[in-house]
Amino acid sequence: MQSSTESGFYRRPPFEIVNPRGKSPVLLVCEHASRFIPEELRQLGLDDEAAREHIAWDIGALALAEALSARLDATLLVANYSRLLIDLNRPLEAPDAIPEHSEIYPIPGNQGLTAAARQERVASIFEPFHRQLTELIDERLEAQRAPRLVGVHSFTPKYRGETRPWVAGVLFGKADAYANRIIGGLRQSGEAIGSNQPYVIDPLEDMTVPVHGDERGVDAVLIEIRNDGLRTPQGVETWAERLAPWL
């Protein structure tokens, strides 16, 4: 039976900051870094295989974000909980902020969630993460170090049976000049690099770029790497090497 409250479940810190004194203007964020779900929630009713799948986290994104942080000497904000508990790249009003279904998977532990349990996730995970991201941006703006906000994500080679042709994509709203520089640099390889593909930034469905970037006049993009390119340490380092000069 689902508990009416989740008070005390979220003992792990909601985020970690890697390289807090990084000198790069790039500020990295990895909202879907972790698949961690507190033991009390029994994987939200998912079996082990589903709980390891891309629905729970962005496979390889954390390793890539850490590699970029090291190469660029950039600060990185890392989320410590699964996106299935609450998606940190969704406004709270978005229908899938706490998803009841994800692709082909029902999420039993999110169905019929009480207002108290929902608020516990908001207060324990969502609000502290976004408060910290706001503070990191504030610090840079106050020091007249205009940041470039870069979200690091991954996507699946196939979605609902349809093959995705891109090896990577860059998603953006108002930061078209910055985004196009990155896209142009990556396209020098001759591979398919998506411009606002495989997703499109939508202020009603996205948080990082519209709220922390566009609304504040900060250049902000999401980098999406197809996750079959991030399955090995060599793949991660290859992508970090390719991305770093253009960020």
Positions of predicted regions on the chain:
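N-terminal catalytic or cofactor-binding beta/alpha core of small enzyme domains
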Residues: M1-L149, S154-L247
